[in-house]
């Protein structure tokens, strides 16, 4: 996966990811310690989703291009998806939607049913995608 901003590039590969500035110099790198199952990046921020299938748990790693230490958030369940939007990481679990700032602080949480697999935030609305339906709900930070 490749994400380009005015200040540089974020490159996500199979075993590691890295940030590069406009001069091509690496400004940050993270080597994966688990099985990468998803990720998202926007404006120099990245959220990586790792899964431990034997323990049925997930971990979210939050990265900032400025070289801050990675923040890891562990979940006692499998996380379905993650997206970076509006300077936050949005996480869809089996039971809810959670929002995290990149310092690892949980900003909000709302319950949702387990029938959704993906989502998209547009303005103050959250669109939840299931196998055969799309639902919209209000979701302000």
Give the location of each predicted region.
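A short beta-strand motif characteristic of beta-propeller blades
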Residues: 24-31, 67-74, 105-111
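Short loop/turn segments that connect beta-strands within the blades of beta-propeller domains
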Residues: 5-6, 13-15, 42, 56, ...
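Blade-level signature of beta-propeller repeat domains, shared across WD40, Kelch, NHL, RCC1
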Residues: 111-141
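Acidic, serine/threonine- and glycine-rich low-complexity intrinsically disordered segments
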Residues: 1-54, 59-61
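C-terminal structured domain segments
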Residues: 96-116
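Repeated scaffold domains used in trafficking and secretory/extracellular systems
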Residues: 1-7, 31-44, 74-87, 113-125
